Amino acid sequence: MAKKKSKQKAGSNTIALNKKARHEYFIEDEIEAGLELQGWEVKALRQGKANISESYVFMRDGEAFVSGMTITPLNQASTHVVANPTRVRKLLMSRRELDNLLGRINREGMTLTALSLYWSRSWVKIKIGVAKGKKLHDKRTDLKEKDWAREKARVMKSALR
């Protein structure tokens, strides 16, 4: 019998990353949530047309929404649908997760930020970070540590030659 070929997609499941969030915030916890999307948005995400660098998550009436996320519509998108690239999108989470997030935001003074957008099978998921803002001196120490690690690696590489 002939063996079946396994279907593997080329590339990564990641659609968009928010590198700025890791620089601006201390990420305490990461949570996965689904997104309520329209058809043209899914097609645009398959092409990788998303930007979440300015996005944030807020709670209203016991539900979570992401704002500031831009999904650029495709050129060949339908003409009868008006595409709003920056619309507020609802996050799909369980009631227990929503209550937990709401409590952490209110009690501990945390904020919610979008960290990454990715495919999980055929569903689009967003990774949310429960975060606390960094002060300027914290950002500077992080940069110094990164520079030192880079310099250390460079010295070790040259020493091994």
Curated annotation (Swiss-Prot):
InterPro entries: SmpB, SsrA-bd_prot, SsrA-bd_prot_CS. Its main location: cytoplasm. GO terms for cellular component: cytosol. Keywords: Cytoplasm, RNA-binding. HAMAP family: SmpB. Belongs to the SmpB family. This is SsrA-binding protein. The lineage of its organism: Bacteria, Pseudomonadati, Pseudomonadota, Gammaproteobacteria, Vibrionales.
